[in-house]
Amino acid sequence: MQTQITLLRFDDRLPLRKTIATIERQYETTLTSKTVYDVTKRVADKATPAYNDIKRKIRRATHLHIDETKIKIQGKTYWLWIFRSRNNVFFVIRKQRNRKVLDEILGYRYRGIIICDGLSAYEEYSRYLQRCWAHILRETRDLAKKHDDAKPMHQWMKDLFAKVKSTSVRDPPKKRKRLYDKCVQEMKKLIEIFSSYQHISKVTTTIQNGLDFWFTRIIHPQIEPTNNNGERSLREMVVMKKIIGTLRNEDGADVMAKVMTLVSTWRLNGASPYYSLKALL
């Protein structure tokens, strides 16, 4: 029953009321909200070694998609962080949205490439970054819809993105380096031209601030140029966040992070959350 309760709550994303109603119907028993919490807390405690093992694997990953979003605990703002590698997904909820979280989860010597947005914590933590092209292209697209004189900039950015995507691990390193240098020079020219447009200056500043990190994929074509994988894995948690509303305490947040880490990792690897959790317990 504990497997069923936990997955109804965190995999099927049922509200507490519906979780209780489903279990009471299926097992002809009576449940309280405290019982549901106690069960999921015991499951999370048993899952802690597996959770920590995923954290160790995340630390060894050659590249990571990292993202963060707000979450409420007792009405106060916390941050839900996701760390996703090729085969693992790791969630953690913290008060901070800064480098301290990266130091805690990845340690002080992580040398993999981080695919991320423009949060300054990433640049403070590492110089091995790939800025997310999906984010910046959404910004330039929105500007182009509002201002005709922003359309050439958006098209130019799309052309640069096409060059970023065009590189392959089969391309010789020297060829990739030439393309990298060419793209950096092109982007500098773009910034120079469009930074004088006051209504575009915010976006050109964003582009300027990430200049060293837009073209990392050209040198390392094994990585993705967008953080879509991170955002995709975060999406289910965002849906759950809307269903749950505000979490009651940090213990409940810890339960959610641990269970969803395991469920998301199992799904990413094509494993059944039901049988995997049952075997773990």
Summary of predicted features, one role per range:
Residues 1-281:
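Catalytic center-proximal scaffold of phosphoryl-transfer enzymes
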